[in-house]
Amino acid sequence: MAEAVDEDSGVGRSLEESSNGQHSQAGEALSEWRSSGQVENGTPSTSPSYWDIDDDDDYGLKPSELYGQYTWKIPKFSEITKREHRSNVFEAGGYKWYILIYPQGCDVCNHLSLFLCVANYDKLLPGSFAILEAGWSQFAQFTISVLSQDLKKSKFSDTLHRFWKKEHDWGWKKFMELPKLKDGFIDESGCLTIEAKVQVIRERVDRPFRCLDCGYRRELVRVYFQNVEQICRRFVEEKRSKLGRLIEDKARWTSFGVFWLGMDQNSRRRMCREKVDVILKGVVKHFFVEKEVSSTLVMDSLYSGLKALEGQTKNMKARSRLLDAKQLPAPIVSVDKDMFVLVDDVLLLLERAALEPLPPKDEKGRQNRTKDGNDGEEVNKEADERDERRLTELGRRTVEIFILSHIFSTKIEVAHQEAIALKRQEELIREEEEAWLAETEQRAKRGAAEREKKSKKKQAKQKRNKNKGKDKRKEEKVSFATHAKDLEENQNQNQNDEEEKDSVTEKAQSSAEKPDTLGDVSDISDSVDGSADILQPDLEDRDSSSVLWDTDALEIHPPSSEGSSRGRGISISTPNGITEGKSHSTMDDSSSTCSNDSIRSGVTNGSYQGNSLNFRNQKSPNKGKNQQVKAMTDAHSLASETDDQPSTLGTDPKGQNYSSEASNVGESDWVVVSHIQEPEGSRNRIPVGRERKTVQSIVNSVDMDRPKEKSTAVLSSPRNVAKNPSPLTQTKPEKKSISTADGIPNRKVLATGPPSSSQVVLPSDIQSQTVGLRADMQKLSAPKQPPATTISRPSSAPIIPAMRPSPITVSSSVQTTTSLPRSVSSAGRLGPDPSLHNQQTYTPQSYKNAIVGNSLGSSSSSFNHHPSSHGVVPTTLPSSSYSQAPTSSYQSSFPYSQDGLLWTGRSPSSVNMGMYNNTYSPAVTSNRSLNHMDVQIAQQQAQSMMTDEFPHLDIINDLLEDEQCSNMVYNGSIFNPQPQVFNGQYSSYHGELLSGGRTRSFGEEGLHYMARGPYGTDGMMPRQWQMTNMDLSLPAMRSNGMEDGTSSAANYHHSYFGLDASNPSFTSGINGYTEFRPSNGH
């Protein structure tokens, strides 16, 4: 433990020795001088009064009381074998000390190690001594020296250290080398002398304090004077340079001068004062450094300078050996009680402090420190006094500069910086205010400019609006005048239309008053009432089965008086389809005969606009159920019909729509001509003249629009049937289509279907007349159907042959049904079988073949007036199914019908298309003879009418003959070789009928072509066939409601019934021609 402490002390000592090398270099002379002066002389010091005075300080013990020294003589030093050797304990400054040496060195070799140690350090307690009030810790400065026989060569070392419990010893491990001890340090007896001087320092922190004893201080001044002077001069030069830079900076100096002079006297006086305690604390803190040996001398110098400064202030006269008054500079700082005050103006003091130099350095130094008797003593005393006065002056100047610098840097300069900052802030505020004012002015200018601009814009806008208002009023005036003019023209036009309508209505009423024998003529149909109810199922719900289709014939037996009293009210009710394979028709087996009332093939109610009627299929609201339609006819409706009403065919086999078109003689297109009933007052008539001007454009538009429709709607004018051949309708069994045409709102439709898969209903000349409904038919309710465009051709339009375009296909699926033997007459009377195969519609785009009508597969129907005197075709011909029936239909101008329906057709192209779809090769006849025969028949029927009742029929028949002949000539040849295919239903009798002709194969079309023979159909019909019990007024029935005399020419279709060799009704009749006799025997 002791070794470790000694080792540490040795390290401390060695370090302290190295730091005090200058003192060690003083040599033995200095050591001897110091020792001899103290020991031998013993006279009081001659230092200045402020240098040695410390009695005015009442802060504990004086430095002289805290000083002690001890000399230790070690005999026979060379014989010591111990590692360490201690001296006796001595007391200094209230502490007990001892000297510790290591003869062989402490942790070093060949060196002498010396340490000063505090005795009983482990027993020391805080506060045991007066000087240790703060505890066990003491600051002390001590000197250890090894005396030589020549005192000038003595070796010594000085150090400053704070002793405390863990650092209770301090010294030098390498104090000196062992070989040097033999150079006069060990005397002849082998004794080594070691001396220790200890100064316990009474430290303070609030002000400079006296540290050293006067004798000990003088000894240290001779060694460390230059160090003390350097410390003080460095500080003063630093402050002077700072002040000099301030003065050299003209701007700052001028600014500071302005600031300082701008301050009032009280402010300047207050700023030039500072408390003493504040200044002195700063002095002690700045200059006292514990590790510096010279710090004690610097503190003694400052203490002496502070005393000199205070003495100058008090004008103390008690001065011994001081510098003369002339040599003393003017003071900068004075002491006023507890305040340091600047004695003059700050500007002057700063210039003076910056320019006034410090006392010059002493370049001589001490050169001889040896003892030369009394002379030497006097010289040393003068040197000591001179050094002390210099240190006192350095201390005073240092304190003054420190006070001036502190007051300037902490008060005046800070105030100056604050003033500058405030001024700058004021300038910035002023600049901002100016900028704000300028911006406000600019904003005001911009606002005024914008307001002016807006005002101008507003004025311009108001001006534009004013001009617009004027222009608008002018335009309103002009438009009002134009509108008034248009209204006036419309009123005039309406008046003209009303007049024409009234004239037409009056003419129609006058024609309606003529007696009509239609009821007698159409005796072929069963006894039915003027109105009929029909159940019409949905198109999708039809059953494809053909087992019980013969039971679909609906017979309605109204009172017989109804048919006799109103012969013109003709009705027919036919099946319109099968729902889920079940018949929804009502059968009455009580009667199989025909009444005077004809079978109504369809009743169509609809609106009439212009020259056309619009028909459209409409599904019934509930699937699988029939829609019951009631239709009533009135005799007066015949008189109210116009020239423009078209006829249409309506069939719906297999739940799908079958569409066909009314056509002229010579074209193979089977169409059921419908009689349209319409309330008399609900029609809007268009004059014939206007119709004739627009019909060509309408026809073209309709022809172009037909391919876009899902179904084909065809109507032909009743008046112009002889002149206007209708387009072709062909069927295809593979394709299905639902005919949808624009229907007429608030109109109920009753349609019938043909009884065979290839049979299509065709209206005759008599049945092509359109019958109007009674007035009370307006009350009937029917589903509203959207309108479709229908066109009727005017009476006087020329017949122009048209090029046949590519066919437009409309397919409909057809079902066939087999008629029961029981219902032969019923099936024959009630209408065609609904089983029709698909047909392909071909529409020539020419005025001649203009299409007028609507879809035939929906609820459209026609009134077919059949002569009551003729019988029906017996059922010996078997009904073919869909797969067995030929797919091509023969559509001739002869309205052959096995069931008593009327058929018509033309268009050889339809035959060709039908032949490609047919698996059979039916017989062919020429088209020319059919056309010619129709003309003859129409003429003979017209001649057989009563002349007094119809005086204008001769003229009409002549016109028809001429026009028909022109048509045949225009077509290119009287012998038109284009084949006309009979309906497959006539395959059973065409052999007998045409047996006189010779057949040949027509390889191109795959059909049998029959040349015109004397016994063929074309040859055996030179004139009209006279039917038994035929009403001669039937061909003239249509003429009753015509506006002009040419209207009867349109009704050239004649009723030819089914021909069969086994049929007993097929007998010789009038004029040698075959006569049809009805099955009832009449």
UniProtKB/Swiss-Prot annotation:
Biased composition (Low complexity): 519-534, 560-573, 858-871, 878-889
Pfam families cross-referenced by the UniProt entry: MATH_2
Organism domain of life: Eukaryota
Ranges of biased composition (kind: Polar residues): 33-49, 588-630, 645-666
SMART domains: MATH
Record's compositionally biased regions (Basic and acidic residues): 359-388, 440-453, 472-488
Keywords for the protein's UniProt record, in alphabetical order: Acetylation, Cell membrane, Coiled coil, Cytoplasm, Membrane
Gene Ontology CC annotation, any one: cytoplasm
Any one biological process term the GO annotation gives: autophagosome organization
Location of N-acetylalanine modifications: A2
Membrane topology: Peripheral membrane protein
Biological function: Functions redundantly with TRAF1A in the regulation of plant immune response. Contributes to the turnover of the nucleotide-binding domain and leucine-rich repeat-containing (NB-LRR) immune receptors SNC1 and RPS2. May associate with an E3 ubiquitin-protein ligase complex, which modulates ubiquitination and subsequent degradation of NB-LRR immune sensors to maintain their homeostasis. Functions redundantly with TRAF1A in the regulation of autophagosome formation. Required for SINAT1- and SINAT2-mediated ubiquitination and destabilization of ATG6.
Protein name: TNF receptor-associated factor homolog 1b
